[in-house]
Curated annotation (Swiss-Prot):
HAMAP family in the cross-refs: Cas1 (MF_01470)
Name this polypeptide is given: CRISPR-associated endonuclease Cas1
PANTHER family: CRISPR-ASSOCIATED ENDONUCLEASE CAS1, CRISPR-ASSOCIATED ENDONUCLEASE CAS1 1
Keywords, alphabetical: Antiviral defense, DNA-binding, Endonuclease, Hydrolase, Magnesium, Manganese, Metal-binding, Nuclease
Entry's Gene Ontology BP terms: defense response to virus; maintenance of CRISPR repeat elements
Similarity comment: family membership: Belongs to the CRISPR-associated endonuclease Cas1 family.
GO molecular function: DNA binding; DNA endonuclease activity; metal ion binding
Subunit structure: Homodimer, forms a heterotetramer with a Cas2 homodimer.
CDD domains associated with the record: Cas1_I-E
Highest classification ranks of the organism: Bacteria, Bacillati, Bacillota, Clostridia, Eubacteriales
Keyword Signal in annotation: no
Cofactor requirement: Mg(2+); Mn(2+)
InterPro entries per record: Cas1, Cas1_I-E, CRISPR-assoc_Cas1, CRISPR-assoc_Cas1_C, CRISPR-assoc_Cas1_ECOLI, CRISPR-assoc_Cas1_N
Amino acid sequence: MPRISDRVTYIYVEHSKINRVDGSITVAESRGIVRIPASMIGILLLGPGTDISHRAMELLGDSGTSVAWVGEQGVRNYAHGRSLSHTSRFLELQAKLVSNTRSRLQVARKMYQMRFPEEDVSSLTMQQLRAKEGARIRKIYRKMSAEYGVDWNGRTYDPDDFEGGDPVNQALSAANVALYGLAYSAIAAMGLATGLGFVHTGHDLSFVYDIADLYKADITVPVAFEIASEYEEGDNVGKISRQKVRDKFIGGKLFATIVRDIQLLFGIKEEEQLNVEPLSLWDNREGNIKYGINYSNENED
């Protein structure tokens, strides 16, 4: 089982049947069957029309893969599975930090400090930090609009009418949802609570929004304006956005970055950081061998 940070970020599946063969899941759809090693997946997003077998879920649970049932285009999250981490120490630390006003403010300031690396925000109030962040985001939108030649009339988003937005807002929505899924995967895999946010509060995904906001300006916003600048009538903006942002995730190793940044935000020492060891079978001749494979002789009864 690879470390959390070494896994593929996410795989989105819809209108398919998912089963299990040895240590892999199989995804069957109209174009054929694809075999994917379960332990290499960070989070499996199950969209509409997806059937998954009990055996496949058993494998995904054993391998620590996060599973989320989502709506079309991934714009809604209905449910999720277990975490990769089987320890509660990070969850206990998160609860401790968020329950104390002073430590919560310290973590929130660290989050804003990541956005303003050349400035000292250690003495700013939450109100001042929010105002500073709002100005930064507006500036980024204006910059991207000018750079890509895309009209920008503000952020508009209706989760019940994805197609109703203009191309850049559609792309932002789809790209952000993919980013939320990735952040959600890392948070859940570490055994943390998605609802215990430091900046956001009152929602079951508050901490997901906290973490995702750290990376939007560098990833989803530029991707969205790039897609909008190349938009042609009939383009599936949601699909294109997911594909482009996925490439950004993989190329920039964002999953590993999120895992690292969360632990830095919480002040976890390097020697205490999460490291999931591989699960193997012991063999007195061959040493450790792969887990999850049937080693019986096919000719045996």
